[in-house]
């Protein structure tokens, strides 16, 4: 039954505070001590939070029981049960305090970048050569779980090399930094992602050679190595299931509301085609085995002897074939831009998934991963990309690019047309547009620029700061 409108003072108790009262009044209809339930919902949604967010799931169910209006005592119950997230959203104190303004700006960037039709599909993997080249989507997830989506954000696409930093993280979690880097280096290669050249360690430092360890975990050789390190004593099935389950945690699939996430999908056709055409990767696999750095799986096949005098059993090294099979399988997982953005936001949030609040990765693992991502994540264009965009990022030939803005957000752009380095053309352009509009480059620091916005502060405060700085400069003759 709907409650009668009572004077707000009659509800004051030890459970209420001036802060809560001020917040209630700020949401009330003019001249009424009541909040419209629909307005309350819309305020939360306009802040960038989603109705199917695990943390708001119970709240929205509760709101449906209040009818059309919320009175002060019910408001106190809501605030008490919903936790800090709702209060921050209502006060405009989430990671992006002006989510609407941010969304409008990214909308404009999206429209502009959509005009770019340059680039080619990844023709060397047949299923990827058949995708719609005009697909274009973006999703942005903040560390507070705010979500921006535009275009084909809900289309499945092959993550390909975007899996590499996460596989590296899984290996770090299992073995630790020192052990992993006995098998793979930390240096930018400056070479194509599938180059066969490895890195040699000697007393005189590092030098190029055809043997020893891969340069870093973000090129194919390094990714095959780190994938081979994950649960190396287990069967392929157990290892692949483990990796899929870890990705599910990263993208928030375990949340009650499922947050627009599905369990990672395996595209067997893509994996098979990579197997049929991946001779270069097979060569890398055997090269890694020859160096002695790929974990050796025990098997009795070597002991078998073909009894025919003019025949023998040709031996394929199972350590290589299984590492490659697992690597091809993980590259062939499909996700949406929103799911990948959630995984990127988990990295931005020091390993804690924004919507489940579960710690998926140790903070040290994330800290160790992001520098490698920054120096080597965009193939042989990594240096130029970081100079221009200034953010850790990873691309894949399926058309995806994700970016990590530490302590703020994860971004994923999907557009399958690629440049000569194998990076999404629109993905790179969109990343450049975002960092040209917003002060998110890692080396912006305290830099001020009247044309660039700090997304972490309310737009009104940013404008006031810019105006104040202009007045101060003018008063000192610096105009």
PLM region descriptions:
Residues 111-150, 402-403:
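A short, well-structured edge-of-sheet supersecondary motif
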């Amino acid at each position: 039954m709907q409650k009668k409108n009572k004077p707000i003072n009659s509800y004051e108790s030890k459970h209420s505070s001036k802060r809560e009262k001020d917040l209630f009044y700020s949401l009330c209809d003019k001249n009424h001590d009541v909040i419209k339930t629909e307005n309350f919902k819309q305020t939360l949604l306009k802040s960038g939070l989603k109705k199917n967010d695990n943390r708001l799931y119970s709240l929205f169910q509760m709101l449906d029981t209040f009818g059309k209006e919320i009175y002060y005592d019910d408001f106190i119950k809501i605030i008490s049960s919903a936790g800090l997230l709702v209060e921050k959203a209502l006060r405009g104190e989430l990671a992006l305090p002006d989510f609407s303004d941010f969304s409008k700006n990214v909308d404009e960037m999206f429209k502009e970048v959509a005009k770019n039709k340059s680039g080619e599909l990844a023709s060397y993997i047949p299923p990827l050569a058949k995708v719609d080249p005009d697909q274009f989507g973006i999703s942005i997830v903040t560390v507070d779980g705010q979500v921006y989506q535009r275009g084909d954000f809900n289309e499945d696409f092959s993550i390909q090399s975007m899996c590499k930093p996460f596989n590296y993280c899984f290996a770090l979690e299992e073995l630790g930094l020192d052990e992993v880097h006995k098998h793979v280096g930390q240096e930018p290669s400056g070479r194509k992602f599938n180059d066969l050249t490895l890195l040699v360690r000697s007393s005189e430092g590092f030098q190029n050679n055809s043997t020893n360890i891969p340069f870093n975990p973000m090129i194919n050789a390094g990714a095959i190595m780190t994938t081979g390190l994950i649960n190396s004593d287990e069967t392929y099935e157990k290892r692949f299931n483990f990796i899929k389950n870890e990705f599910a945690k990263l993208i928030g699939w375990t949340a009650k509301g499922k947050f627009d996430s599905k369990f990672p999908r395996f595209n067997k056709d893509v994996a098979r085609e990579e197997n049929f055409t991946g001779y270069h990767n097979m060569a890398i696999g055997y090269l890694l085995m020859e160096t002695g750095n790929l974990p050796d799986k025990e098997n009795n096949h070597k002991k078998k002897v073909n009894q025919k005098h003019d025949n023998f059993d040709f031996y394929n090294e199972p350590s290589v074939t299984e590492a490659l099979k697992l690597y091809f399988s993980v590259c062939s997982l499909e996700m949406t831009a929103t799911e990948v953005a959630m995984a990127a936001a988990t990295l931005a949030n020091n390993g804690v998934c924004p919507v489940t609040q579960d710690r998926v990765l140790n903070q040290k693992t994330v800290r160790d991963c992001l520098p490698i991502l920054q120096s080597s994540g965009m193939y042989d264009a990594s240096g130029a990309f970081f100079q221009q965009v200034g953010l850790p990022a990873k691309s894949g030939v399926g058309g995806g690019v994700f970016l990590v803005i530490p302590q703020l957000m994860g971004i994923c752009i999907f557009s399958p047309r690629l440049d000569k380095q194998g990076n999404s053309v629109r993905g790179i352009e969109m990343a450049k547009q975002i960092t040209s509009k917003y002060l998110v480059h890692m080396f912006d620091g305290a830099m001020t620029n009247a044309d660039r916005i700090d997304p972490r502060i309310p737009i009104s405060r940013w404008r006031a700061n810019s105006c104040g700085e202009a007045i101060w400069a003018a008063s000192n003759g610096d105009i």
